[in-house]
A protein has these predicted regions:
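Conserved ATP-binding subdomain of kinase catalytic cores across diverse folds
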Residues: 2-75, 114-117, 156-158, 276-277, ...
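Conserved protein-kinase catalytic-loop position immediately C-terminal to the HRD catalytic Asp
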Residues: 110
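Regulatory N- and C-terminal appendages and interdomain linkers associated
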Residues: 136, 141-345
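ATP-dependent phospho-/nucleotidyl transfer catalytic cores
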Residues: 20-104, 114-221
């Protein structure tokens, strides 16, 4: 995730415990230590607000601002400014997840950092075939944390943060609620604007107007209807004239591609410039779920680290084309249908 350009915690160490862990099958137990700029979550604010007094909540909030957002201390209303700042951090984070096809899998308030970093890599996975309802987590039977539901869950979690901060935003509870609500109500417009920008950049555009928006929507619809791989579709666009995959050698895709070229020309964007932008924002490689599983089985059961090392190498340079590792771009034949992740994943 770090090399994909996504704010994230980082792995520090793995220590074997010698114990057995029972998930979908029996695993060898281990403890993974991760580091990040803060382990304070929305859930931390909920705990302090619900179980401790207002003075402690005020001191805790002051500490968070001093440590992570000192510029907010001079704001007329630091707690409200903190809510706005965390909201923007979280919008940027989920936009990055959507850009690369990442599904977190368990987005409760204890798994939402106030610094906008990805952490708690439990039942997470990367999407192959594009569909907004894609779910991999074995415990997410209702699809609450599906790929396309993630922005809504972020907003829900921000509501929880706002509720925790109400006593500090204003002594008048009704006034505080109204002020917090105004911040939360701004979420959809801010998110949607950044979502359009992200999707535009993935296609090489510098700005997004109505023509670009329709083109983006049509591409996503085409991917969904044709069960096209999310990552590889953008690579297919960038390498259209060298394309050998039959899925992208069809009249309907050719028609869409021609519209894309026409809109680029109308915006005075050269094909080479667009492709350069696309290369910087569309990964060549993602950690394909079936390959990750296979690499772990090979390493743990057979002491064969070949695939593991290949995945490690490409994950450190995910935006660089590496012809010798083309096989790592291949999605599973069934698009990961039936694949499930667990808390130990």
């Amino acid at each position: 995730m770090y090399h994909l350009g996504v704010p994230t915690s980082r792995s520090l160490s793995v220590v074997s415990t010698g114990e057995k862990v029972y998930r979908e099958k029996v695993h060898e137990g281990a403890v993974l230590a991760r580091v990040m700029s803060s382990h304070i979550r929305v859930g931390t604010f909920e705990y302090v607000s619900n179980f401790l007094d207002v003075a402690i909540l005020q001191g805790f909030t002051n500490y968070v601002i001093k440590r992570h957002y000192p510029e907010l201390a001079k704001n007329a209303n630091p707690p409200l400014a903190l809510l706005k700042t965390v909201m923007n951090k979280q919008i940027d984070l989920v936009i990055n997840w959507l850009r690369i096809g990442f599904i977190h899998g368990v987005m409760n308030t204890d798994n939402m950092s106030i610094t906008g970093e990805t952490f708690d890599y439990g039942p997470c996975a990367f999407m192959n075939n594009y569909h907004p309802d894609t779910v991999f987590s074995s415990i997410d039977v209702q699809g609450r944390y599906a790929f396309g539901q993630q922005p809504g869950i972020v907003q829900w979690n921000l509501v929880c943060l706002a509720e925790a901060l109400i006593p500090l935003i204003d002594k008048d509870a009704d006034k505080a609620v109204k002020m917090a609500q105004e911040v939360i109500n701004s979420f959809p417009a801010i998110y949607k604007e950044k979502w359009w920008q992200m999707n535009g950049i993935k296609l090489g555009f510098t700005s997004v107007a109505e023509n670009e928006k329709q083109l983006i929507e049509d591409l996503l619809t085409w991917m969904q209807n044709n069960q096209a791989d999310y990552t590889n579709t953008y690579l297919a666009i960038a390498n259209y004239y060298q394309q050998t995959d039959e899925k992208y050698i069809t009249p309907d895709f050719a028609q869409w591609y021609q519209r894309w070229e026409d809109i680029l020309k109308a915006n005075n964007i050269s094909l080479s410039s667009a492709l350069k932008t696309m290369q910087q924002h569309n990964p060549e490689f993602i950690p394909r779920n079936h390959l990750v599983e296979k690499s772990l089985d090979n390493a743990c059961l057979q002491q064969n680290f070949t695939l593991f090392n290949e995945l490690l190498k490409t994950s450190k340079a995910p935006y660089q084309a590496q012809s010798s590792y083309k096989h790592l771009q291949t999605p599973p034949p069934d698009g990961d249908k039936g694949y499930k992740t667990f808390c130990g994943t």
